[in-house]
Amino acid sequence: MRGSSRFRPHEKLRASDDYQRVKRSGRRVRTAHFGVNFAANDLPHHRLGLVVQKRYWNAVGRNRIKRRIREWFRLNKTRIPAPYRDIVVVARPGAEKLSSLDVTKELLAIFLHKDGRIR
């Protein structure tokens, strides 16, 4: 399980400018518990950024949902086909109550059709 299944530091979206670029020029999709913005990048891999607002949860809830989203990305990043993207996931109220399986189903449904193709 080593190698591509790890969540490496270069796969994290860090710079504020990158978050703004994805928000400005990227595609937006909303689900019941998440807002997802994504835009193509020029890198040989996907990158993940998280937005979890303090006003909705205490620290335990915020950290729980961030862990579950990172785990979804770590396990499924190879299932999201090229072009490689910067992905920003914004957690919405109620997301902290989702199981890891529910998070995976909801986020993966954004990127894949029922037959496995990218949207």
Swiss-Prot record:
Which residues lie within the region annotated Disordered? 1-24
By what name is this protein known? Ribonuclease P protein component
The UniProt similarity line reads: Belongs to the RnpA family.
Catalysed reaction, written as an equation: Endonucleolytic cleavage of RNA, removing 5'-extranucleotides from tRNA precursor
Assembly information from the UniProt record: Consists of a catalytic RNA component (M1 or rnpB) and a protein subunit.
Lineage summary: Bacteria, Pseudomonadati, Thermodesulfobacteriota, Syntrophobacteria, Syntrophobacterales
Q: Which gene encodes it?
A: rnpA
| NCBIfam families listed in its UniProt record | rnpA (TIGR00188)
**Enzyme Commission code(s) on record:** 3.1.26.5
